[in-house]
Amino acid sequence: MTIKTLANILLAFLVICSTAACDMLESHPYDTRVTGETGINAKNIQRIESLLKGRKSFRFAVISDTQRWYDATVDAVNSIRDRQDIDFVLHGGDQSDFGVTKEFLWMRDIMNRLDVPYVCAIGNHDCLGTGRDVFRTVYGDTNFAFTAGDMRFICLNTNALEYDYSEPVPDFDFMTAQLDKMQQDSLTRCAFLMHAAPQTDVFNNNVAKVFQHYLHMFPGLQFCMHGHTHALTVKDIFDDGILYYQCPNIDKRIYLVFTINEEGYDYEAVEY
């Protein structure tokens, strides 16, 4: 056997082995490489602001804590689509259970079946492992805001327990900037979305009263929305008139619908 023939045999063997190995190898669950659509919140915020510009009334849905419950989430998306009266959808966080990259991508692909724009807040489970990095890639900043019609929606990261003081959670500077933005744009009402409400386990309750004080600075605060404890609740947590509406986990097969009009708002818990 010549050296050239032997070299060709070895080369063929290596090609076969490498091909077989590629078929057997899978990426690490916490690999942060993302395939498919990214930067979803920013793109959908543009759509929301454009579609609702100048409107005094609109309707939106809230879902939350979809982690693991893919079939129930598909059914919720279908229910919202069938209504034909929803202008946009808010997700209250915890798309993932373990912060695994594929969890975000699976849930993103389900949410993309909506025929209206949606945005997602970050939940405490979304922060596990490399989840917060994947969230930033797929959705964007963990604090963000937008204007729907004449109303400002301020979406906050309140999962302080997962950050160990490495970032300000909640971010009072961001809240102050949003207050300034409302004044600049002459907006007279607003609402807040967060995953964990004050007095829950992952909120920084050392600053809970300070947080509530900040909320009172915002003109025309209508209500706050959150998820996290997997229950359907409406609470005046601080007995000061600010209502916190909690959307249960999607396995309860319930989502919330808010109708905004010039007189105020209506609220409904929809079972599907």
Regions found by a protein language model. Name each.
Residues 73-148:
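Core catalytic region of metal-dependent phosphoesterases/phosphodiesterases
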Residues 25-41, 46-47, 63, 146, ...:
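Binuclear metal-dependent phosphoesterase catalytic core
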Residues 50-61, 145-155, 182-190, 237-243, ...:
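Beta-strand-turn-beta hairpins that frame and shape the catalytic cleft
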Residues 25, 81-88, 163-243:
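His/acidic metal-ligating clusters that form di-metal
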Residues 65, 93-94, 123-124, 195, ...:
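Active-site glycine-centered loops adjacent to acidic/histidine catalytic or metal-binding residues
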Residues 1-22:
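Sec-dependent bacterial lipoprotein signal peptides
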Residues 22-106, 187:
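N-terminal active-site segment of His-dependent metallophosphoesterases
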Residues 56, 69-76, 92, 103, ...:
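Stable alpha-helical elements in mature extracytoplasmic
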